[in-house]
Design a protein with these regions (language model features):
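Histidine-centered active-site/metal-ligand motif
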Residues: 19-21
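Short Pro-Cys-Gly-centered "Cys-loop" motif that presents a nucleophilic cysteine in a tight turn
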Residues: 1-16, 26-128
């Protein structure tokens, strides 16, 4: 639904138990703050409804960093993909259900954009 309301691409993501990582590219002069506010508030509403809870889901406001180079993009992509492994939740990043790498492996492309084949060949050995 967010992509119908705002124009943006999600390049990678990982939803952890207390935070989320997203590589998000706003398109057509969209506001990153407005996109994130909408995504995080809708997520919190659905999360609270699903678990019959009330109140805050997120500890703090979101923070953002601009990715300035291709090498920084690769390292950020890998950092996000490996987050559940570093947290010792899973042994392999592809085993964690709530991340972009798992979605890519399963062919689920409704949330994030599929990276080009050359990029996948470059990063995949560093993930699995």
């Amino acid at each position: 639904r967010a992509k119908r309301k705002y124009h943006f691409e999600i390049k990678n993501f990982c939803i952890m138990n207390n935070h989320v990582h997203i590589i998000l590219k706003p398109l057509k002069n969209e506001s990153l703050s407005k996109i994130m506010q909408w995504i995080l508030s809708v997520f919190a509403i659905r999360y609270n409804r699903h678990f019959n809870l009330a109140g805050h889901v997120w500890y703090d406001r979101f923070t953002s960093k601009i990715i300035k180079s291709y090498s920084q993009y690769i390292s950020t992509f890998l950092y996000i993909a490996r987050n559940p492994v570093r947290a010792k939740i899973v042994k392999h990043a592809t085993d964690f259900h709530y991340n972009g790498i798992s979605f890519l492996q399963k062919g689920i492309l409704d949330i994030m954009e599929r990276p080009p084949n050359y990029f996948l060949r470059l990063i995949w050995p560093n993930i699995v």
